[in-house]
Amino acid sequence: MGRRRAPAGGSLGRALMRHQTQRSRSHRHTDSWLHTSELNDGYDWGRLNLQSVTEQSSLDDFLATAELAGTEFVAEKLNIKFVPAEARTGLLSFEESQRIKKLHEENKQFLCIPRRPNWNQNTTPEELKQAEKDNFLEWRRQLVRLEEEQKLILTPFERNLDFWRQLWRVIERSDIVVQIVDARNPLLFRCEDLECYVKEMDANKENVILINKADLLTAEQRSAWAMYFEKEDVKVIFWSALAGAIPLNGDSEEEANRDDRQSNTTKFGHSSFDQAEISHSESEHLPARDSPSLSENPTTDEDDSEYEDCPEEEEDDWQTCSEEDGPKEEDCSQDWKESSTADSEARSRKTPQKRQIHNFSHLVSKQELLELFKELHTGRKVKDGQLTVGLVGYPNVGKSSTINTIMGNKKVSVSATPGHTKHFQTLYVEPGLCLCDCPGLVMPSFVSTKAEMTCSGILPIDQMRDHVPPVSLVCQNIPRHVLEATYGINIITPREDEDPHRPPTSEELLTAYGYMRGFMTAHGQPDQPRSARYILKDYVSGKLLYCHPPPGRDPVTFQHQHQRLLENKMNSDEIKMQLGRNKKAKQIENIVDKTFFHQENVRALTKGVQAVMGYKPGSGVVTASTASSENGAGKPWKKHGNRNKKEKSRRLYKHLDM
C-alpha cells in the first residue's frame, strides 16, 4: 500500500508560520508609526549565510579594506591598450633583455654566498652557531633587498643553513675545489663568488671548473669556451661523466654518436675527439709535458675504493683557515668590478708562484682527469701526504655521476632533487688522493625569466603552471627545420602577411606535436600542456640541443649542429629531386586567396544508417510489392553495403579543422 497522506488540516501550522515570516520581512524595511521590538540596530546573527573569513585573496582583501575605510571606486574609461602577440608568449623583447643584462653586470658583486664567521679554539659551539645564524640571516635579507629594489629574478637557492655548513667544511678540507657545471650553459651554473671565497680562506687552494656533458659540444664550441675561460684566468676541464666510463676509440665513433644524438636519441653515446685537432690545440694551449696514459687501473677493489664518512667531531683534527689571512669581502667584490686583466694581475701578485693558465679543449678520460688533479696543486696541502679534491655543483649537472665514474662503481646515489645528500663524504680513489663529496647546493644566480629556469632544469617541469613561455623559448632557440626533423612533424607555415623566417609559436608546435602523437583532450583538441612536458624534457635532456655561446659570440652561428642538420636536409632534398621522387606534401598553408575563393558545397548530413535491406530513410512505408521488386534485382544482403558506405564527417571535412 502507498504511504498514508496527512489530513488537509495538518499543514495549517506551517501556513501560519510561513505567513508570519513573510509579514515580518515585509514590515522590516518599511517605516511605520507602530511600536516594534525589531529595531535593526545591531548585527543580525541569525542569518543563514554567516561565514567566518580567515583568508582572503589580494583582490578581496583590497576591496574589504576599501569598504572599511569608506572609499568608493568609480570605473573610468581610459584609452585602449593593445597587447602585442610577443607579450602573450612570456618572452622579453630585445631592449628589455639588454636592460636586464646591464642590471646583472652592475649588481654582480652583490650576488655572493654566505661566509662562515671567524672562530678559534676559544669559541664555544653555541657562540659559533649563533654567529652563523646571524650572518646567514643578513645574507638572506641582502638578497631579498636586491630582488625588491632592482626588480631582478634570482634562481631558487638553498635556504637551509645546514647545507651551507657542509660547504664551508668541504672548502676548509679541500686542496682543490672543483665546480661542476653544465656544458650547455656554463655561466649559469658557475658561481664566481665561490672562487673568491676559496682564495679568501687560503691562497694555496686551487679553483677548477669541470664542464660536464661536454660531449654535447663540438670541437669548435669547446675551443671557444676554452679560450674564453683562459682570458678570464680560470682553469677548465672538459669532461663527460657518462662517456668517461667508456674508452675513447676514434673519430668515426664520435661522428656517429653525435649524429645519433641529433637524430632523436636521448642517451649519450660514446664520445671521442679528433686526434689531429687535439694535437693542434695542445700545441697552442698546453705546455710541453708527457701526456698521461689512457690505460685505466682497476679501482673496484675494496682497498682502492675505501669509503669513509667524516663526522663533525673530527673537525678539530683538520687545519682550518680564517678569513683574516685573505682579503676582505669588500676587497673581493671590488676585484670583480674590475676587468679580468687587472684581476689576474692582482692574483699573480698575491701568489707569484702560480703558473700561467692554459686550457685545452678535448675531452679527458678518467685517468687523465686524475692526473690533472695531481699536477694542478703543487703548494702546501691541508693534510700532509694527501691531496683532497672537493666537488661542488648543482644537483642536476652530473656531480654524482662524475663521482661514480671516477670510483668505477656506484658509491653515491644519483638524484636530481636538492638535499638528497645530507652530509659530506670522503671517497678514497687511491692512496694519497681523496674526493670530498659536498651535498648538492643551488647557489643564487641571475636569470631573465622563469621560462629560462624551467628550460635549464632548475625548476621541475611537472610542476610548472604556464607552459607557453618555456615552449616559446624552445621555439626561439631551436630552428623550425630541427623541430620538424626531430619529431617528424610538419609545422604550419607563416601567413603571407608575416615574416616567412619567423620562429613557430608555441601553439603551432604543440598542436602539430599533439596531432602526431595522438595527445587529444576530451573535446577533440590537441593536449598542449601534455605535449609541452614531453618537449621540455627533451630540451633538458639534450635531445633538442641548444648551446649557449660565450659572451661576444653570435648565438645563431655558434649552433654548428643546427647548420649541419640543415645542410644534410638540403643534400637529401637535392638527391630526391635528382631521382625524380615527389617531395613530401606539406601541410595546407594559410594562403588568403585559397581561403577566400574556396567554395564549399552546402549539404545536409544525416545520422544513422542510410539504407537497411533496401529501405532508404524518408522514402515512406515499404510495401510488399516494392520490396519484392527490389529483391528481384539482386541480393543486397551479399553486397555488404560497401558501395555507398557512409563516410565519417570528420574525415570528409578534415581540411576545415585547421
From Swiss-Prot:
This is Large subunit GTPase 1 homolog. Keywords: Cytoplasm, Endoplasmic reticulum, GTP-binding, Hydrolase, Nucleotide-binding, Nucleus, Phosphoprotein, Protein transport, Transport. It comes from the Eukaryota. It catalyses: GTP + H2O = GDP + phosphate + H(+). One of its GO terms (cellular component) is membrane. GO terms for biological process: nuclear export; protein transport; ribosomal subunit export from nucleus. Residues 1-31, 250-355, 623-658 are annotated as: Disordered. Residues 16-28, 636-658 have a biased composition (Basic residues). It comes from Homo sapiens. The gene is LSG1. InterPro entries: G_CP_dom, GNL1-like, GTP-bd, P-loop_NTPase. Its main location: cytoplasm. Residues 164-444 form the CP-type G domain.
